[in-house]
Each structure stands twice: as C-alpha cells, then as structure tokens.
From Swiss-Prot:
GO cellular component: a single term: cytoplasm
PROSITE patterns: HEXAPEP_TRANSFERASES
Disulphide linkage map: none
Sequence similarity: Belongs to the transferase hexapeptide repeat family.
EC number: 2.7.7.13
Function: Catalyzes a reaction of the Smirnoff-Wheeler pathway, the major route to ascorbate biosynthesis in plants.
Pathway(s): Nucleotide-sugar biosynthesis; GDP-alpha-D-mannose biosynthesis; GDP-alpha-D-mannose from alpha-D-mannose 1-phosphate (GTP route): step 1/1
Record-listed GDP-alpha-D-mannose binding positions: L6, V7, G85, N109, D111, G146, N173
Keyword Electron transport recorded: no
Keyword annotations of the record: GTP-binding, Nucleotide-binding, Nucleotidyltransferase, Transferase
Protein name: Probable mannose-1-phosphate guanylyltransferase 1
Residues reported to bind diphosphate: G9, G11, T12, R13, K23
C-alpha cells in the first residue's frame, strides 16, 4: 500500500519553530510530528510514503533518509511548483500512487495527531465498498468547522456544511482518508480542494463513507492546540503504553522524558510535559504543560508552564516562562527574567522581562 502526506505550506502558525525546520519536522512527544504518522502507516503494511510538499523539500528528504532504512519504508517527495490545495497534490503524485495494483491508498494531513487506527480504517473501507472513506471526529463546537452530515445507519456521507449557523451535526473531517485509485480520475492538476470539490462529487454518487475516529484527535498546527494535543497524546500513552512514561517522586501526572535527558534533584515535573533528547533540567525546576525540545537546558529553580522551549535553548536560573511563551531555536533567557507569552525568534538573548504577549525579533 501507498500513502500521501499533505505537507504543504510554510507553517506560519507555528513560527518561530518553523523558521528552523519545516513544520512536519517540529518535535512532538520527543520525535518529529510526521514520524508518528509514518510509523503508524508502516505498521499496517504501507511500503511507500509520498510527501506532497512545496517548501524546503531537500531538508525534509535529507532528514527522513535516516528513517527510510530504520523503518524499512520508501519515502519520496512530490514537489509542487505552485500551491495546489488539498487535491491537486494527488494529481501531481498520480504516477506514484496508482501502481496498477488497485489497492486503496491513504491521504493524511500532516498536522493531525491521533491514535491512527489505520487497520480499522482499512477494514471499514473494504466492508462498506465505497470509493472513498474519510475519518470524522466529534467536536463540541461544530459551528467553527466544516461539518460532515452522514447517515448513522449506513455511514454514508450525505453532504458537507461549512461553519453551520444551525446545528446539523457534530462530526468534522479529521484529515485522514482511504481512497480507491479511481478517485485520481476525478482530480485535475490545478489548485483544487479535496474537501470542497472532490468529496462532494463522490458523495453525490453515493460512494463516500465516514468512519468515526475512536480515541483522541487534534490539529496541532498552532501553539495552543499543540499543547492540548500533547496532553491528549500523553493520556493515550498512559492507556496504551504506560511503560514509556516517566515515574518517580518528582513526576506529577503524565510525563515523557527521553532516556538521554538529565533531570536534577528536587524538581517537580508534570502534568503533561515532554523533555526531549539531550536536555538538561537542573535542580529545583518546575515544569508543567510544556515541551522542552532536544538539547535545551533549564537552569536551577526555573519555572515553565504552558510553553514550548525550542531546540538548544536555555532558560536561566529563577526565570519564569508561561502563558504560551514560544522560544525558537537557540534562544537564551537570562537569569530571573519573566516571559508572559513572549514569542521569541531563533538565536536571541532575552535580558529583560516580557510582561505581555509579544513577538521578540
């Protein structure tokens, strides 16, 4: 089987992290976002993953070449010369996806994190006999999204309603699809939306079905959702693979600490924290609802909450970092400095406090 991951744009909503690497390579749960998807695809027998990309393809490929051999899966790029929306990339990668086997192929949005129940999706797609199956997830406030209206008895998709004013349902597109090769015949090589142009036509032909996604789901394309997504991901690990989580007197709730990270004495870490490879957390540090990425150092008695600390950054002694502060790569927060929602571009030194949310350039 094959899979296409829609990598797409510039990741502006996750800046300053995406100033250093393309968004799918930003660490989430101590490994690049896209690796969670590739590993799950490999588990259900996918042999080739095509990345639909228009930004820094060489960076992506160089990075993922290491994982090709480790995972035993072929990873290739399909590069857009102009943005092609969410359907155009399928037409561009047609030769890679339609291999003559007749097997369906996966299409994934690279921002989506979930438990990736791909085996169940394959079974659902086969049993319903449709041309395409989309995964949907239930949300509390459907008026913010495009809602998928479906027949509960048959799982057949009837129509799509964009940001409904009145309640028509609470299921939204989860950005995970399984499509028959015939879907490629419906798509022209031009900027096209799969959600607004292709799927409604398949639904009109009674060929589109929707599977309700079990477990958690989050689009982690922006910082606040990234932090929420981390909480949901760690909750899922607690249920499915609790041995991967840290334990001990210094741990509160769900905490993921890489085996190469060093935690000092007298720290309190958690809930909902990821500490990445090679990180050093010195004595007496307090961490909650945050990510500390590869190679970062948190000095004695610093306090970090609801924030993202970028690669190789340093948070000084007695510093306090909170309220969706995002430090880009190699940022140095000096001792006793306070950051209230600062968004700091890479390679900066912060010598004075940031008292209200602002971008530091």
């Amino acid at each position: 089987m094959k899979a296409l991951i829609l990598v797409g744009g510039f990741g502006t909503r996750l800046r300053p992290l995406t100033l250093s690497v393309p968004k799918p390579l930003v660490d989430f749960g101590n490994k690049p976002m896209i690796l969670h998807q590739i590993e799950a695809l490999k588990e259900v027998g996918v042999t080739e993953v095509v990345l639909a990309i228009n930004y820094q393809p060489e960076v992506m490929l160089n990075f993922l070449k290491d994982f090709e051999s480790k995972l035993g899966i072929k990873i290739t790029c399909s590069q857009e010369t102009e943005p092609l929306g969410t359907a155009g990339p399928l037409a561009l990668a047609r030769d890679k996806l339609a291999d003559g086997s007749g097997d369906p192929f996966f299409v994934l949005n690279s921002d989506v994190i979930s438990e990736y129940p791909f085996a169940e999706l394959i079974q659902f797609h086969k049993s319903h006999g449709g041309e395409a199956t989309i995964m949907v997830t239930k949300v509390d406030e459907p008026s913010k999204y495009g809602v998928v209206v479906m027949e509960d008895e048959t799982d057949k998709v009837e129509r799509f309603v964009e940001k409904p004013k009145v309640f028509v349902g609470n299921k939204i597109n989860a950005g995970i699809y399984l499509l028959n090769p015939s879907v490629l015949d419906r798509i022209e090589l031009k900027p096209t939306s799969i959600e607004k142009e292709v799927f409604p036509r398949i639904a009109a032909d009674n060929g589109l079905f929707a599977m309700v996604l079990p477990g958690f789901w989050m689009d982690i394309g922006q910082p606040r959702d990234y932090i929420t997504g981390l909480r949901l991901y760690l909750d899922s690990l607690r249920k499915k693979a609790p041995a991967k989580l840290a334990s001990g007197a210094h741990v509160l709730g769900n905490v993921l600490v890489h085996e190469t990270a060093v935690i000092g004495e007298g720290c309190l870490i958690g809930p909902d924290v990821a500490v990445g490879p090679g990180c050093v957390v010195e004595a007496g540090v307090r961490l909650s609802r945050c990510t500390v990425m590869r190679g970062a150092r948190v000095k004695k008695h610093a306090c970090i909450s609801s924030s993202i600390i970028g690669w190789h950054s340093t948070v000084g002694m007695w510093a306090r970092v909170e309220n969706m502060t995002i430090l880009g790569e190699d940022v140095h927060v000096c001792d006793e400095v306070y950051s209230n929602g600062g968004v700091v571009l890479p390679h900066k030194e912060i010598k004075s406090s940031i008292l209200k949310p602002e971008i530091v350039m």
